[in-house]
């Protein structure tokens, strides 16, 4: 994950000093891109241990169209707790926009199902896109989507994905987002009988919080280790039928976890 460490180093050393919504303060750059060849390993950061359970269950939660944290909490995942209301609701966040984008005629658009069908039917289309950032609903969301939109691309039998992330918390958020969308690409590829290609991560406001600078230095001082491999144990009948137990990561030998506060 040299690409990720290079980005962290660049922002830590060259980033502009900025204020932010949380009052924490950041070092920030505008516009950065990384590319990961998914044939060369699963892009899971090795310079600190990530909680893979949270990454997988969150993605399954998104794909279910769910916006209440009960499913996450029932499965030991707490990453959305700080933003939920007293009943566990987050408003019309990712899952709602992915699976039930409101149409002007009162119906709803299942973007995920539409894109999956479109890839199978017309792989060369330039319209394989899913958008989570719906301006009409931003004020109703507990947290507006940071990873705002993604696009698939098919060439030579391989499926690639590019994510645009409007707001990128380098230390805590970005490693999760890279792994999540890499996993999503593998799932789509399996359902479409394609190999995986590249995952391209594109960031807008790419930042390190001031209370993550010491942790970033600790991580930068560590030597990256070989990437693990992802194995999907079965091919479900539907993209929406995957379960946590279907995914196996082998060869993941990370450095120890580094604690850091979440900016809420």
UniProtKB/Swiss-Prot annotation:
Any matching Pfam family: Thymidylat_synt
Keywords linked to the UniProt accession: Cytoplasm, Methyltransferase, Nucleotide biosynthesis, Transferase
Reactions mediated catalytically: dUMP + (6R)-5,10-methylene-5,6,7,8-tetrahydrofolate = 7,8-dihydrofolate + dTMP
Top EC class of this enzyme: transferase
Catalytic residues identified in the record: 146
GO biological process: dTMP biosynthetic process; dTTP biosynthetic process; methylation
Residues that coordinate or bind dUMP: 21, 126-127, 166-169, 177, 207-209
EC number(s) from the headed UniProt entry: 2.1.1.45
InterPro entries registered for this protein in UniProt: Thymidate_synth/dCMP_Mease, Thymidate_synth/dCMP_Mease_dom, Thymidate_synth/dCMP_Mease_sf, Thymidylate_synthase, Thymidylate_synthase_AS
Binding annotation for (6R)-5,10-methylene-5,6,7,8-tetrahydrofolate: 51, 169, 263
Pathway: Pyrimidine metabolism; dTTP biosynthesis
Keyword Transcription regulation: no
Superkingdom in the source lineage: Bacteria
A GO CC annotation given for this chain: cytosol
Location within or outside the cell: Cytoplasm
Molecular-function annotations in GO: thymidylate synthase activity
CDD domains given in the database record: TS_Pyrimidine_HMase (cd00351)
Family: Belongs to the thymidylate synthase family. Bacterial-type ThyA subfamily.
Subunit composition and interactions: Homodimer.
Function: Catalyzes the reductive methylation of 2'-deoxyuridine-5'-monophosphate (dUMP) to 2'-deoxythymidine-5'-monophosphate (dTMP) while utilizing 5,10-methylenetetrahydrofolate (mTHF) as the methyl donor and reductant in the reaction, yielding dihydrofolate (DHF) as a by-product. This enzymatic reaction provides an intracellular de novo source of dTMP, an essential precursor for DNA biosynthesis.
Name of protein: Thymidylate synthase
Originating species: Hahella chejuensis (strain KCTC 2396)
Lineage: Bacteria, Pseudomonadati, Pseudomonadota, Gammaproteobacteria, Oceanospirillales
Gene behind this protein: thyA
């Amino acid at each position: 994950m040299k690409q990720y460490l290079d980005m962290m180093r660049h922002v830590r050393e060259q980033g502009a000093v900025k204020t932010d919504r949380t009052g924490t303060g950041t070092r920030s750059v505008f516009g950065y891109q990384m590319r990961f060849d998914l044939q060369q390993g699963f892009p899971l950061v090795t310079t600190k241990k990530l909680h893979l359970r949270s990454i997988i269950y969150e993605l399954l939660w998104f794909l279910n169209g769910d916006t209440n944290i009960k499913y996450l909490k029932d499965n030991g995942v707490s990453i959305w707790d700080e933003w939920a209301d007293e009943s566990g609701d987050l408003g019309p966040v990712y899952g709602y926009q992915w699976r039930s984008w409101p149409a002007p005629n009162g119906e709803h658009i299942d973007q995920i199902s539409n894109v999956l069908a479109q890839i199978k039917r017309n792989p060369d289309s330039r319209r394989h896109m899913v958008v989570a950032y719906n301006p009409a609903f931003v004020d109703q969301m507990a947290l507006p989507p940071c990873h705002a939109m993604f696009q698939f691309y098919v060439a030579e039998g391989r499926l690639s994905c590019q994510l645009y992330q409007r707001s990128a918390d380098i230390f805590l958020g970005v490693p999760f987002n890279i792994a999540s969308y890499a996993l999503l690409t593998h799932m789509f590829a399996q359902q479409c009988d394609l190999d995986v290609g590249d995952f391209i991560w594109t960031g807008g406001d790419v930042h390190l919080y001031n209370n993550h600078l010491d942790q970033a230095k600790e991580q930068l001082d560590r030597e990256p280790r070989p990437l693990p491999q992802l194995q999907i144990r079965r091919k479900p009948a539907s993209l929406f039928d995957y379960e946590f137990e279907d995914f196996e990561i082998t060869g993941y030998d990370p450095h120890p976890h580094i604690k850091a506060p979440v900016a809420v």
